[in-house]
C-alpha cells in the first residue's frame, strides 16, 4: 500500500497488532515466485518444476515450521487448484511419511496474486483477512509474503453461475451480504476505493500500451473504440456522478461472483457453525446466522474489499448472475445479459437482506426493498467500467488462462450501453 494510504488509515490497535504478528516477508524477497509462474505452462505438473517446489517449500518451512522444516522435497506434494482470475492457487501437502509434529496443518493453500491492487492494498487486505479469520468467518491466515499468502485449505466447492441465482441460494447470499455490510473493519472508511483503483490501473495501462492504441468494442454499444485518454475522461465523468450518490457507505466485498462464494464440505476448519443461541443473540459481526440444517456458504477473496457504497456490491453481484466463468473454451466465459435478475428477484433478495440486518419494521420491508432496487441500478455501469478497465490491464499482468482482452472490451461495451443510468445516482433518497 502506498505511504499516503497507510498514513491516513485508522486501525484498531488489537486488530492491527494481530495482523502485525504475521511474518511479513521483506518486499521483493519472493518476487521471483511470480516471475516463475508467469513463464510456466499452466498444464505442467507443479511437482516437475524444481524451482517452484523449492520456493513453496521455503515459504511453508518459514511460516509453518514443524514437519514443514524437515520434509524433503520428494515428500512435499504440490497441485494447482482452479481459482480466481487474478491469482494462482496451489495445494501444498505433506506426505503420510512426514505427519505434523505439533499443531501445524498437513496441507495449506498457497495463493500467488497477479492482481494490480496487491501492492497498494496489501496492508488493508492483510488486516481484513486476519480479522475475518479471528472471527471464524474465513480461513486461518498462516503467512503473508510479497505477492501472496499461505492460508488454511478448506475442502469446498464454489457455486456455479446458475446456482447463485437459485431462490434458496440467493436468500443465503443476501443474508451473508447483510452481515458483511454490518462489519466494523479498521481500514479507511471514505468510499473512494473504486475511483482510486481505476486511476492506478489506467496509469499502469497507459505505461504498457501505446498512447494512441485503440481498444475495439462490440458494435452494439454505440462506441466503436476507446483509448486510454478516452477511459481517463470516462473515469472523471464517473467520479463526478458517484460523488453524488446517497447510497450508504458500508464495508463491501466488491467482488461477489460465483467463484468467491464457497459451499464447504462437512469438515470446514476455521469456519464456525453457529449454534441456535448464536442465532437468537443475532450477533452483529456473525456472517452466518442461519438454520443449522442448511448448508453453509462462505464468502472468500476479499482482495478488492473496501468501504464503499453498498449499492455497488448489490449491482456487481446481480451482474454476476449473467456471467458464467465455467466455460472450457476461449475466451472461458459467457455473458448472458438476459439472466440479470427480474424486479421481483431483486425485491426478494433485498427483503432477506433487510430482515437479516434486523433494523427495519416488517410493515416497511417491501417499500425499503423497492427503494434498494432503485438505489442499486445506477451502479450497474459503474461495475462494468471497473471490471472493464481491470480486464484490459490483466492482459498485461496475468498468466492465468483467460480471455482478459475480450472480457475487458465486453464489460466496457456494457458500461456504454448502460451509461445513462448514472444520471440517477443523485436521485436516490
From Swiss-Prot:
GO cellular component: cytoplasm
Cofactor(s) it depends on: Mg(2+)
Lineage: Eukaryota, Metazoa, Ecdysozoa, Nematoda, Chromadorea
Cofactor notes: Mn(2+) is a poor substitute.
Species this protein is from: Caenorhabditis elegans
Record's keyword annotation contains Transferase: yes
InterPro entries: Kinase-like_dom_sf
Gene expressing this chain: cka-2
pH effect on activity, per entry: Optimum pH is 10.
Catalytic activity: choline + ATP = phosphocholine + ADP + H(+); ethanolamine + ATP = phosphoethanolamine + ADP + H(+)
Residues holding ATP: 82-88, 111, 152-158, 257, 301
Effect of residue 301 to A/E/N: Complete loss of activity
Residues annotated to bind Ca(2+): 258, 320, 323
Similarity remark: Belongs to the choline/ethanolamine kinase family.
Phenotypic consequence of residue 255 to E: Severe decrease in catalytic efficiency with a 5-fold decrease in the affinity for choline
Phenotypic consequence of residue 387 to A: Severe decrease in catalytic efficiency but no effect on the affinity for ATP and choline. No inhibition at high Mg(2+) concentrations
EC class of the enzyme, as a word: transferase
Consequence of substituting residue 303 to N/Q: Moderate decrease in catalytic efficiency
Key words of the record: ATP-binding, Calcium, Kinase, Lipid biosynthesis, Lipid metabolism, Magnesium, Metal-binding, Nucleotide-binding, Phospholipid biosynthesis, Phospholipid metabolism, Transferase
Regulation: Inhibited by Ca(2+). Mild inhibition by high levels of Mg(2+)(>10 mM).
Name of the featured protein: Choline kinase A2
Purpose: Catalyzes the first step in phosphatidylcholine biosynthesis. May contribute to phosphatidylethanolamine biosynthesis. Phosphorylates choline and ethanolamine but the activity is much higher with choline.
GO biological process assignments: CDP-choline pathway; phosphatidylethanolamine biosynthetic process
PANTHER family linked: CHOLINE KINASE A2 (PTHR22603:SF98), CHOLINE/ETHANOALAMINE KINASE (PTHR22603)
